[in-house]
Amino acid sequence: MNPYFQTPPVVKNLIIANCVLFMAIRLIDPINHFCAEYMQLWWTNNPFAPAFHSYQFITYMFLHGGFGHLFGNMFALWMFGRTLEYELGSQRFLTYYLVCGVGAALIQIGVASLLGENLTLLGASGAVFGILLAFGVMHPNNMIYVFPLPFPIKAKWFVVGYAVLEIALGWSGVNTGVAHFAHVGGMLWGLALLLWWRKQRKIFF
């Protein structure tokens, strides 16, 4: 069987971990007290809000607000992450995923601080947007189908278009429940890391 049709270990285990935690939280902690208190990322001046902890830069990536949020992120991770893990290697792929996720949170915190806004953050979207960026950079001319478009587009144009859309939505303030700048941040940190690795001749594209 072609290995590219199989799911490599890091992608598989990330999907399992996210899904298991999603189900466990709804069975054990249905009103999300534990998650809100300890696992999602808090950045706020509200003295009554849960405290910020540095480990939340990791744990927030494994929480999702609903099934649609979880499914969208895990489907994109599975679709694009498999190829990248085979090409980067499992250890480097995991490093890339985590760097994008942490970097996404840092960018969103920076924007929230500049605007004087309180922030709570959860979800793997920042890391997944980094995965999308990497696929577009390393396979720019691959044709992909994007719902609801009736025709395929090149991966590079999908990534550019998505980045522009996220920036526009972030600045417009539309759909304020979505961390648009975290999505952009995941892409930026991902691009920086890919360029650094290429400079070090650890990857080629």
PLM features: what roles do these ranges have?
Residues 1-205:
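A detector for small-residue-rich transmembrane helices and their helix-helix packing motifs
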